[in-house]
């Protein structure tokens, strides 16, 4: 690793993602090019084959719903028959046979969820490189504690496609505990309650000093973990969307869920209402011109109270209790044994969620961490440990689900029980089920069910050339090896001959090494083009806002101006509009500069022609000056977005 090079920490979230580093002993959350610390996990593909990532992608979702991909994390490492509820929640297409790994349909193209996530990771990587002033090659990336082997491997693949060596995959609650407990001096038992956009995790940890006088360090030991990878803030949004859409359908006979653009507007409005109801007793959803029928345009106006919202999400929030109680049971603890409850994830801001947490533990949760950023900060701390920058932290994580093989009768025989500390190696000796059997098939499963086929098949492989013998005589040793990332390798060896077969569970994410290498090359080859397209979109947004402001100014003062007064401005506006329709960035910027010059001249004419020179002239100069300066790009685009909505 290059001198001074950092291992960055990344929280790859369902809704938003965050990147952080350690500067000395202090964590630093790195802002993106838009100046925000949270980057929406959104990727959009325009009709002009442009790829947009993050906030700019989120802003254009209303007008481009079927080509805007969000919540891709819900589909990482998942087969089509595992995402039937999730695919109904998104406007873009989900493809693949029932047992196939999911692909995302955008126009005529298909993308794996790993490729979509890689575009988000690359943006975070570039943000870190811009901040640090040098290339970044390594990252610690977090995943939900309850992610299975396939989902972990898919996350690692996404990092590789983005051009990152994934130094470690760590669980989100564990990362949050690192950030929470690093500077604490006392020993304590904590529980991390992590409810994000698409997943729910809960982990019980013991945080203590190592007791080593020569090398004092803080030990973070995960005792147990549990969760639900089908539960999060997206589900809260969906509950509100369905309620509002059903009420609108009762009144108007139109189901907005069948109109992709209307549904996208409704989704954004409901997400906004959900956030507002965390601090307000009620809020309004106002969506003018949401649709139309033969009688004309229809408008959606509805008041939502916090009590109604809590009624809608009550069953979802109650689902949080089960994993919490299971984690406590696995840890051999009662709620009273927990010293602190640490809330992580934006969805924990919902008052109903906090009420449930308080009802379980009998006390208010700890509120001293930023729930949106704490996971990335913890990942950055682990990155600094792996980089050798600090040696005062020891992290002991666990595997969230039982791992085993199918044995006679279809039984699931466990080799690695859930909540086993990792890295771990476990082995057991098995034999044949029939006389003179010369080959066995090892089928590897993950899950808690007693019958193997009720669990998730990770892989299967054959061990052949076993010496013929009566059943029960051959000795076959099966070994499971789980690395620090929670990713599994399995081997089987016939002990008499030493004949061995093994498999690293890499196929679980449906990407081969050659797939990843090709996707990485494609991403690198298109990096400059992606950057150019991003700049092109930003330039178009800027000139569109310029035109809007100036046309508004001309309209407000139309009675004071002659056609000759307006001619130079109209010519400049037409020129910049034409330039914005094309793909020449230099031409757009040149036309924008000409428009700024024309706006300055126009403000002078308007000033001279206005009777109330002081007041009107100042207004005109202020408006034109704001336009000439370009304004704040974020504010400009937000305003445009709100008008569309």
From Swiss-Prot:
User: For this protein, what is any one GO molecular function term?
Assistant: ATP binding
Chain segments carrying region Disordered: 509-530, 615-645
Phosphothreonine: residues bearing it: 199
In the induction comment, the record states: By stress conditions e.g. heat shock.
Low complexity bias (residue ranges): 615-626
- Alphabetical list of InterPro entries matching this protein: ATPase_NBD, Chaperone_DnaK, Heat_shock_70_CS, HSP70_C_sf, HSP70_peptide-bd_sf, Hsp_70_fam
Q: Acidic residues compositional bias: what residue ranges?
A: 631-645
Compositional bias ranges of the Basic and acidic residues kind: 518-530
Which GO terms fall under biological process for this protein? Answer: chaperone cofactor-dependent protein refolding; protein refolding
Keyword list, A-Z: ATP-binding, Chaperone, Nucleotide-binding, Phosphoprotein, Stress response
NCBIfam families in UniProt: PRK00290.1, PRK05183.1, prok_dnaK
The record's annotation in PANTHER family points to: HEAT SHOCK PROTEIN 70KDA
Function (record text): Acts as a chaperone.
UniProt lists the family membership as follows:
Belongs to the heat shock protein 70 family.
- Which HAMAP family does this UniProt record tie to the protein? DnaK
Identification of the protein by name: Chaperone protein DnaK
At the highest ranks, the source species' classification is: Bacteria, Pseudomonadati, Planctomycetota, Planctomycetia, Pirellulales
């Amino acid at each position: 690793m290059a001198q001074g090079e950092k291992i960055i920490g990344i929280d790859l979230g369902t809704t938003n993602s965050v990147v952080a580093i350690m500067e000395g002993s202090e964590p630093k959350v790195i802002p993106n090019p838009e100046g925000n610390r949270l980057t929406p996990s959104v990727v959009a593909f325009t009709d002009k084959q442009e790829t947009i990532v993050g906030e700019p992608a989120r802003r254009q979702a209303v007008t481009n719903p079927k080509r805007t991909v969000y919540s891709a994390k819900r589909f990482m490492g998942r087969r089509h028959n595992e995402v039937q509820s999730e695919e109904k929640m998104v406007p873009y297409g989900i493809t693949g046979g029932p047992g196939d790994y999911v692909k995302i349909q955008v126009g005529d193209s298909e993308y794996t969820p790993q490729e979509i996530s890689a575009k988000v990771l690359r943006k975070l990587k570039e943000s870190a490189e811009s901040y640090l002033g040098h290339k970044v090659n390594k990252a610690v990336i977090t995943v939900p504690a309850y992610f299975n082997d396939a989902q972990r491997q898919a996350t690692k693949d996404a990092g590789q496609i983005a051009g990152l060596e994934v130094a470690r995959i760590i669980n989100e609650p564990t990362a949050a505990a690192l950030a929470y407990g690093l500077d604490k001096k006392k020993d304590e038992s904590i529980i991390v309650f992590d409810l994000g956009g698409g997943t729910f995790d809960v982990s019980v940890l013991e945080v203590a000093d190592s007791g080593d006088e020569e090398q004092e360090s803080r030990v973070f030991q995960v005792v147990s973990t549990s969760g639900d990878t089908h539960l999060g803030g997206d589900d809260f949004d969906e509950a509100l969307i369905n309620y509002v859409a059903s009420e609108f359908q009762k009144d108007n006979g139109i189901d907005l869920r069948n109109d992709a653009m209307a549904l996208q507007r409704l989704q954004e409005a409901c997400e906004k209402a959900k956030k507002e109801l965390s601090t307000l007793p009620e809020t309004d959803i106002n969506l003018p011109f949401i649709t139309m029928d033969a009688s004309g345009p229809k408008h959606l106006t509805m008041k939502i109270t916090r009590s109604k919202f809590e009624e809608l999400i009550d069953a979802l929030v109650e689902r949080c209790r089960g994993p919490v109680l299971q984690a406590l049971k696995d840890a051999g603890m009662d709620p009273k044994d927990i010293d602190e409850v640490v809330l992580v994830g934006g969805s924990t801001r919902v008052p109903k969620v906090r009420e449930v947490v308080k009802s379980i533990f009998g006390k208010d949760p700890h509120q001293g961490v930023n729930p949106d950023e704490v996971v990335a900060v913890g990942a950055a701390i682990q990155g600094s440990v792996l980089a050798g920058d600090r040696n005062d932290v020891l992290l002991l994580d666990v595997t969230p689900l039982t791992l085993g093989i199918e044995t006679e009768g279809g039984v699931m025989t466990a080799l690695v029980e859930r909540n086993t500390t990792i890295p771990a190696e476990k082995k057991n000796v098995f034999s044949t089920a029939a006389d003179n059997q010369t080959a066995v098939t090892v089928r590897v499963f993950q899950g808690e069910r007693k019958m193997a086929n009720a669990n998730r098949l990770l892989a299967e492989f054959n061990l052949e050339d076993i010496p013929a013998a009566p059943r029960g005589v051959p000795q076959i040793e099966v070994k499971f090896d789980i690395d620090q990332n929670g990713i599994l390798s399995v081997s089987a060896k016939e002990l008499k001959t030493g004949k061995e077969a093994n498999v690293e569970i890499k196929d679980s994410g449906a990407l081969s090494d050659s797939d990843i290498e090709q996707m990485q090359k494609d991403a690198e080859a298109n990096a400059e083009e992606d950057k150019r397209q991003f700049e092109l979109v930003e330039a178009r947004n800027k000139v569109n806002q310029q035109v809007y402001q100036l046309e508004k100014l001309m309209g407000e003062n139309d009675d004071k101006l002659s056609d000759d007064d307006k001619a130079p401005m109209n010519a400049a506006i037409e020129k910049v509009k034409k330039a914005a329709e094309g793909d020449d960035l230099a031409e757009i910027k040149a036309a924008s500069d000409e428009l700024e010059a024309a706006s300055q001249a126009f403000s002078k004419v308007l000033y001279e022609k206005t009777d109330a020179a002081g007041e009107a002239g100042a207004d005109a100069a202020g408006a034109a000056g704001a336009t000439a300066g370009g304004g704040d790009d974020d504010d400009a685009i937000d305003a445009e977005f709100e008008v569309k909505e």
